């Protein structure tokens, strides 16, 4: 496993710069551009002893982080033991079967597999940005989207366009190769489960549902 992991790390220096840009700069710009919500004025003042990261926020950050790491670790293990040229070959049984298989890989991770891994990683963060938008609002992530289309929506589009351009044209600079349109569609649809799970949880916690 260590040889496969080191191969990934050596290839991901410029990729991680892009990921940091997404998670820090772009995400901050997207969330800061959201229109003001009058409901904030109904909340009681926060105590001076309150932490910036509340317990619910910390629980969500830790929980999502653990799930992402667990899934991506399994994906890396799967790619290590399977020769994947398209996600249409993906097998749940193969994914689960290779999860704890620490034997030496039969082949090195291919540039295509590494490009798939990189894109899955980025789009998991992309969809989770929508969950961050709706955090503690008890509303859908799509609520008031029309009012934030020029800010949040524009940044979201910039992230998607940037990821496509990097993977398609980044070449040796980003250690990537172009993905097929089929794989782009599968990654977009598959990683979006992060958003839909968040929507389901928010629906269960909404005042209307509780009543």
Indicate residue ranges for each PLM-predicted region.
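Alpha-helical transmembrane segments
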Residues: 10-26, 109-123
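Single conserved hydrophobic/aromatic residue that forms the stacking wall/gate
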Residues: 1-5, 9
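Transmembrane alpha-helical segments that form the membrane-embedded catalytic/substrate-channel core
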Residues: 21-29, 33, 122-135, 160-164, ...
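Membrane-helix interface motif
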Residues: 73-95, 168-171
